Amino acid sequence: MAVVNFYGTGRRKEAVARVFVVPGEGNITINGKSLEEYFPRKTLQIIVKQPLELTNTVGKFDVKAKVHGGGISGQAGAVRLGIARALVQADPSLRPVLKKAGFLTRDPRMVERKKYGLRKSRRRPQWTKR
């Protein structure tokens, strides 16, 4: 018998996550490691679990994610979006709840590029009047 798995792609800053949600007992695996192992910081673990907790599906699905690029915060955001999209694929009735919480919206904020003549994207060199 084929295992029914639901897929969602999440992106945040430079991070890209490919997330598979399978009916199971609530194991979350990211790049072959457990959630606590991959994201030792508690706040990032909370971010990843948010869509599951909001929809009361914590113990009902196993989550398997492959994530690359960006930093740890961007990766956590990407996994969250991927989980939310996969949950909607699994159960379309969850869409309004996740949409209202903003978990189905891709965060468009990206790093602004550095401009020539400036030290960073907006920071100017110090100007001396006299």
UniProtKB/Swiss-Prot annotation:
GO terms of molecular function: RNA binding; structural constituent of ribosome
- Write out the entry's keywords from A to Z: Ribonucleoprotein, Ribosomal protein
This protein's GO CC annotations: cytosolic small ribosomal subunit
Q: Which GO terms describe its biological process?
A: translation
The source's superkingdom equals Bacteria
Q: Tell me which Pfam families the record gives.
A: Ribosomal_S9
Name the InterPro entries for this protein. Ribosomal_Su5_D2-typ_SF, Ribosomal_uS9, Ribosomal_uS9_bac/plastid, Ribosomal_uS9_CS, Ribsml_uS5_D2-typ_fold_subgr
Q: By its UniProt entry, which PANTHER family does this protein fall under?
A: RIBOSOMAL PROTEIN S9, SMALL RIBOSOMAL SUBUNIT PROTEIN US9M
Q: Which family does it belong to?
A: Belongs to the universal ribosomal protein uS9 family.
Stated name of the protein: Small ribosomal subunit protein uS9
**What is the organism of origin for this protein?**
Carboxydothermus hydrogenoformans (strain ATCC BAA-161 / DSM 6008 / Z-2901)
